[in-house]
């Protein structure tokens, strides 16, 4: 399966039991900041933004004082899982980022999608990639 198919079929899909509820944007990005695949709506990010995200995975709490920035949008960092998941909130939406051995899985959402639904979609794919050694 291509990386784009993972984004299209496993991240940008209808959320179980909620037809027409789906993430607004998603991507799989290498630890080096290279985009493996992304939705058409995923924001163009700056290398410094990706560096900040990677630093927070290695030094949990790094982004808490300044917020998480992606594509110029600032998210307030909320409780995640140290070294594994970063979660952010902005207004009625937010972001979930799951770290795997080689990549970061991103999901961005707006209402009516809930934070829990975004977490489920992103973390399920991230866990699968980890099981595959990726």
Swiss-Prot record:
Stated name of the protein: Profilin-4
Keywords assigned: Actin-binding, Allergen, Cytoplasm, Cytoskeleton, Disulfide bond, Phosphoprotein
Function: Binds to actin and affects the structure of the cytoskeleton. At high concentrations, profilin prevents the polymerization of actin, whereas it enhances it at low concentrations.
SMART domains per record: PROF (SM00392)
Post-translational changes noted in the entry: Phosphorylated by MAP kinases.
Cysteine pairs bridged by disulfides in the record: 13-118
Highest taxon above the source species: Eukaryota
Motif Involved in PIP2 interaction: chain residues: 84-100
Predominant cellular place of this UniProt entry's protein: cytoplasm
Subcellular location: Cytoplasm, Cytoskeleton
